[in-house]
Amino acid sequence: MIEMSFDKETVLSCEGQTDPTSQEFNINDTSALHPPGNTTENNLSKDAGSEASLEKSATTDNNASSESAVLGAESSKQSHNGTKPQQQKVNKRRNTMSAGFKHPGYGKRRRRANSESESVLPTNFLLGGNIFDPLNLNSLLDEEVNKALNAETPKSSPLPAKNRDPVEILIPRDITDPLNLNCLSTGDSLLVSPLKSGGGRRRHRNKHHGANTGRVSTEGIGLTESNGCAAVKDDGTSLVSMTNVHLESTIADQTLLDSTLESSNKSSLTSNDNEVKEKTVDCSTAHLTANPTNPPSSRQRKRRRAGSRTENSSSSSEQHNESQGGNSRSGVSDRQQPYPNQWRPQYSNNNQNPQQPKKKFQYGNYNKYYGYRNPGMSEDPRIRVMNPDWFRGKDVLDLGCNTGHLTLFIAKNWRPASIVGLDIDGSLIHAARQNIRHYLSEVQVQHSRRSGENTKADRGEVSGEEKDKDKTSKHSFPVSLRISRGPIAGPPLPETNTHSLPPGDFPANVTFIKGNYVLESDVLLQTQREEYDVILCLSVTKWVHLNWGDAGLKRFFHRVYKHLRPGGLFILEPQPWSSYNKRKKLTEAICKNYHSIRLKPDQFSSFLTTEVGFSSYELIGTSQNYSKGFQRPISLYHKRPSSLK
């Protein structure tokens, strides 16, 4: 153990500071007397020289302090060679010192003093740099310095050559479909580059020269003359000659050739009489230039694209020649022969549908009504507020049936005895009749599913003729695809003369008729007979009101009442008055009728019960639609039975 003896003077010396020379002497003595690894006894006795050393250290100047710091460092190094218990004792004595006085030999102070010594920075860099650029990367910015460094040995990487060409950015035609996934044609997949657009200055210049001179530019046409082609020569007169056409060419190629001849004939008429030019058009190469992979056509396409922006639409729609008609096929000749800009608007106007006057839909006869009213829905939400018992086995009239989706749903699922769809637009009636085939396809799919489930049970009882039919049907079209996708072609429409199906079975119970339900005068109301049990009038009253005014709408309601049998039902869905304002400027007659309307939609119920003759009415519900404009209340009006008259 370490025996420690404290005297009064020793304790007083601890309050100050011991001399590092005395510490060094004591440590050396103890290390000599007691070797490392053995237990030592340290006796601290009174030393007369300790007070003198304390006074000396307190009165020393800055130079003496620095010397004591060096001595303290040496003493600390020697203490590390001593025993561990002795080192712990010294640390304890140092920790008892006052916080105001810091000895230069203190551990943290010693390390800080060592860190403040000046470090030697490198001066020789192998790559020729400096302290701020050791790798000499700045030399890559100067070509001369780079060449000098790489003259003997490639110490640094060579400077890459700068590409002075601007970066080409391809812009899709439709920013909402950058990958062109919605278009099935390959011609529309070409991306537009702003570097090759040419700008508007060149377009105006060509337009200016084309308007003044009227000359035909034939540069860049590398078409050779061959058999089966059309030659156009301008010698003061225009001559168009057409020779043998290949028998193997299709009808589309012949129409393509005709449009080429017409466009070349037009261009020859605009040329001057003093200027003689020869142009030859090869029929075989004319079809090949439509392919974007052909190098000559690609050069012409770039040149045409730089000349006018309208060329993009013409070149992209070139792949739709069969669907766009004969006018769009002339785009091939325009690409081969870049005519002046005065002919381009004529070509573009023929293909741009927005240039044509839009149909106003004066009577609300929208051709995509169910598409935007019920987007992504298989059934009309108005069906949920109706009761199937109202229609089962009854005679039904649907006023304003449009394309007949609601009419066909009622006819197929609720099995009325007969249902008639009436609309003023003949094209909508034609579409409704074609939609019967769609519903028949669904019926066949259901039958095929049922038959597929029962084929295994009834396989032994099938006759020979039915087996042959099954074999032919299996070879012609897979049963699984018929179940999942329906037949390839819809079934034919049933003939009206035949009565093979019993009444009430679809599609024998549905009929579509074109007609105007609003009579010309009130006198014709006297001739109306009772024919129907249920009459539907869904979202029609606004169009009757705008086109025929209050008088026409009142006549419309009176005819509905007379058309119903006793106890009949009238299902009405009127549009609100706020929706009238959006369509008041369609025609002059509509605008005039709009300002003369006095019978508002909120007054229909009182008018139908007091003046028309309906006994009662009830609100059966409001259709739940995504659009608030189509969330309209539906009312049911009752006609008195015959016994109560």
From Swiss-Prot:
GO terms for cellular component: nucleus; ribonucleoprotein complex. One of its GO terms (biological process) is RNA methylation. It catalyses: a 5'-end triphospho-guanosine-ribonucleotide-snRNA + S-adenosyl-L-methionine = a 5'-end methyltriphosphate-guanosine-ribonucleotide-snRNA + S-adenosyl-L-homocysteine. Residues 1-10, 450-473 have a biased composition (Basic and acidic residues). S-adenosyl-L-methionine-dependent methyltransferase that adds a methylphosphate cap at the 5'-end of 7SK snRNA (7SK RNA), leading to stabilize it. Also has a non-enzymatic function as part of the 7SK RNP complex: the 7SK RNP complex sequesters the positive transcription elongation factor b (P-TEFb) in a large inactive 7SK RNP complex preventing RNA polymerase II phosphorylation and subsequent transcriptional elongation. The 7SK RNP complex also promotes snRNA gene transcription by RNA polymerase II via interaction with the little elongation complex (LEC). PANTHER family: 7SK SNRNA METHYLPHOSPHATE CAPPING ENZYME, BICOID-INTERACTING PROTEIN RELATED. This is 7SK snRNA methylphosphate capping enzyme. It comes from Danio rerio.
